[in-house]
């Protein structure tokens, strides 16, 4: 393309990226200094906060005021106190604390250039999978679950998985996380039974959510590794794979989908949720930034395009493969 045919250069894209980086820097600094935990449930004056944190008062004031502007702190004549989001998600001791996830991901992202040069991951994904990282990653839904469950249930209605059309469904939620994506089905239909599969630490979050929703007796919690756990044979009407397949190479994804096919009853439905890359890999921002995050931990990972998902599902024996939304693909095990 000639220079004359191009759009005029717009610096706003660069400015917007820099603005995002400034906000992240403020959040990182506050987490590293343990600002939110130090302030806790009370109100601290600047001098009290500086003494407790071990910081220069003037410099700390600049940081705390910026946190107020970002809505994470509130400021009064008495001093600083936590905003509702900071109290829920950024203060240690909260059951929905997620600050360590933010710090760990930020530290990994700062090493992106090293990963690109070497092709080697910044850390061991297996260590993340077996530890508390994903439990903390899911924990914010202990606060936000009500709205999310309603949104997810609306999606299930669009897919035709409801009490009147699929009564008493047997559902397998693979890598279930907090459970918000499937648990609404059990609340709507008392006869629904869900097998929630994930690591033991993550299942503790899912158990808390099920208890709050009053559906614990309808959920079977199964601790296991999604790469190797036996999923059963012809047991389920629906299998849900949420934001999972892009952790797998095509060969490993095919292996998982083979097990999913066997786990489904004939005529059963697999629902794949994923950030789907456009075919040219140049336009879908969420999908392509997800690919960057995955690269940090698992260089062999792949954010797939729609055509690639169709090939994976078709190769595993599924039919009626359809894109049903921005991040949803469904397919059926033939009867």
Give the residues covered by each predicted segment.
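Conserved SAM-binding loop of SAM-dependent methyltransferases across substrates and taxa
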Residues: 178-189
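Conserved SAM-binding strand-loop segment of SAM-dependent methyltransferases
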Residues: 215-226
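A short glycine-rich, Lys/Arg-flanked "PGG" loop and its adjoining helix->strand segment in the class I
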Residues: 254-266
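Conserved Class I S-adenosyl-L-methionine-dependent methyltransferase catalytic core
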Residues: 17-21, 29-30, 61, 65-168
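A short acidic, Gly/Pro-enriched loop at the edge of an enzyme's catalytic core
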Residues: 227-239
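C-terminal alpha-helical "lid/dimerization" subdomain adjacent to the S-adenosyl-L-methionine
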Residues: 273-315, 320-321
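Conserved class I S-adenosyl-L-methionine
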Residues: 166-177
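Core SAM-dependent methyltransferase catalytic element
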Residues: 316-335
């Amino acid at each position: 393309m000639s220079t004359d045919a191009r759009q005029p250069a717009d610096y706003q894209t660069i400015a917007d990226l820099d603005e995002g980086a400034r906000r992240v820097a403020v959040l990182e600094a506050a987490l590293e200094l343990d600002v939110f935990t130090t302030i806790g449930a009370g109100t601290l004056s600047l001098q009290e906060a500086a003494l407790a944190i071990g910081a220069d008062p003037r410099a700390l004031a600049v940081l705390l005021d910026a946190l107020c502007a970002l809505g994470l702190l509130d400021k009064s004549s008495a001093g600083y106190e936590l905003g509702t989001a900071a109290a829920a998600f950024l203060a240690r001791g909260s059951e929905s604390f997620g600050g360590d996830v933010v710090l760990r991901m930020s530290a990994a992202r700062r090493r992106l250039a090293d990963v690109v040069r070497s092709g080697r991951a910044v850390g061991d994904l297996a260590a993340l999978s077996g530890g508390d990282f994903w439990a903390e990653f899911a924990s914010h839904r202990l606060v936000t679950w009500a709205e999310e469950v309603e949104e997810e249930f609306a999606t299930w209605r669009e897919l035709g998985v409801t009490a009147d059309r699929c009564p008493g469904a047997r559902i397998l939620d693979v890598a279930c996380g907090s459970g918000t994506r499937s648990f609404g089905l059990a609340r709507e239909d008392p006869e629904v039974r869900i097998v929630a599969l994930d690591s033991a630490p993550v299942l503790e979050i899912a158990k808390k959510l099920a208890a709050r929703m009053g559906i614990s007796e309808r959920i079977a919690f199964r601790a296991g590794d999604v790469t190797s756990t036996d999923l059963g044979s012809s047991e389920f009407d629906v299998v849900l794979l949420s934001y999972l397949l892009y952790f797998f190479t095509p060969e490993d994804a095919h292996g998982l989908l083979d097990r999913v096919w066997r786990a489904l009853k004939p005529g059963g439905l697999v629902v794949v949720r994923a950030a789907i890359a456009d075919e040219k890999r140049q336009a879908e921002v969420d999908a392509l930034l997800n690919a960057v995050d995955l690269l940090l931990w698992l260089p062999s990972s792949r954010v797939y395009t729609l055509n690639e998902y169709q090939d994976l599902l078709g190769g595993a024996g599924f039919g009626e493969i359809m894109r049903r939304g921005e991040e949803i693909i469904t397919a059926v095990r033939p009867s």
